[in-house]
A protein has these predicted regions:
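Helix-capping/transition residues at the boundaries of transmembrane alpha-helices
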Residues: 17-18, 93
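Alpha-helical transmembrane segments
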Residues: 26-133
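PRPP/pyrophosphate-binding module of the type I phosphoribosyltransferase fold
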Residues: 11-15, 24-28
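Membrane-helix boundary/helix-loop-helix interface segments in multi-pass membrane proteins
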Residues: 1-11
């Protein structure tokens, strides 16, 4: 059962980060905050691969962020926002492997903003009669 749940998690978080990439600095700033949070979880769970991935993602986003504040000089595009979402979703799964309840709840709380934005977007489309996809 973990494989289908993990796949839904990865696809959901990846697309959630892509959907919130409409405003300058939102996806990259939120991604940096979430990456730092998940890196701390991986550190506490002694998941050193997750710590390495989290620090790399955090460093890349912090380095990119000043160029993406309004007026933005460069943009993530779909590829960048999808990469951030994929990295965060895998990082959350990596921290979940050893730590128990804390590692389960904190990634959900950290990723609540993009996930809720996605759910609201889907609900808005369904209510207006448009297709979800």
């Amino acid at each position: 059962i973990m494989l289908p749940v993990s796949l839904v998690w990865i696809v959901g978080v990846t697309n959630a980060m892509n959907l919130i990439d409409g405003l300058d600095g939102l996806s990259s700033g939120l991604g940096a905050i979430i990456a730092a949070t998940l890196t701390i979880i991986c550190w506490q769970a002694e998941q050193w691969v997750g710590v390495t991935i989290g620090l790399a993602l955090f460093g890349a986003l912090i380095g990119y962020l000043p160029f993406n504040f309004p007026p933005a000089r460069i943009f993530l595009g779909d590829t960048g926002s999808l990469l951030i979402g994929f990295g965060l979703s895998v990082l959350a799964l990596e921290g979940y492997r050893k730590a128990a309840f804390l590692a389960f709840i904190v990634p959900i709380l950290a990723l609540a903003i993009p996930l809720l934005a996605t759910l609201l977007s889907i609900a808005r489309r369904l209510r207006s009669g448009k297709g979800v996809f």
